Amino acid sequence: GMAGLNFAGNAVYRKPKEGRDNIAQFEFIPWILGQCATVQEARTLLAHINLVDTRFSEQFPTSQLHWILADRDEAITIEAVEEGLNIYDNPVGVLTKNPPFDKQLFRLNDYSYLSPDQPVNRFSEQLQLQLYSRGMGAMGLPGDLSSASRFVRVAFTKMNSVSGTSESESVSQFFHILGSVAQTRGCCRLENGKYEITI
């Protein structure tokens, strides 16, 4: 599967170049999925691509996006930026909006202490500290609505989730993972008076 997410302020598309596959950002997903069954096949196509700044309609600006592409074995993130086209291995298999993927992935280092297990008292052997709630191994997991925090949260959720044995259990688990980063109407107001929401 493949998805494009908002990448405002970072996406840079080029003018068409001879000898390259000049693809508009709105054509990118069907162009890849129409020709590739695996991420490896997509890597071959991406070696010749030039994402161009063609608008879908003169009424709308070009959508600034970055993409995640995944098959059952691996995932990559694709970003067209000022320096060129960056293709990153995506070991967590998730993506949110800004910042660029390499920064999002690096930020996971700040949360290496998180665990699905109950924590052990390392504060002091002289104190008898109590575990007063389940889930305390994940204390410090970001809960705000910024893209960077949502990336950490969904990466932790996905990497530690356990699916059941049936298809319906796996589908249910998938939607629980997505729910960990859902935007609720009213919690993130935009400058134009509208709200950032998850549909």
Task: Give residue ranges: language-model regions.
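Peripheral peptide segments
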Residues: A8, Y13-K17, E74, E83-G84, ...
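A short, polar/proline- and glycine-enriched secondary-structure boundary/capping micro-motif
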Residues: A11-P16, I87-V92, N98-P99
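Proteins synthesized as precursors that undergo proteolytic processing into mature forms
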Residues: G19-R55, S163-L178
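Short, contiguous, pocket-lining structural segments
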Residues: R20, G34, S57-P61, I68, ...
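Aromatic/basic-lined ligand-recognition segments
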Residues: A75-G84, D89-P91
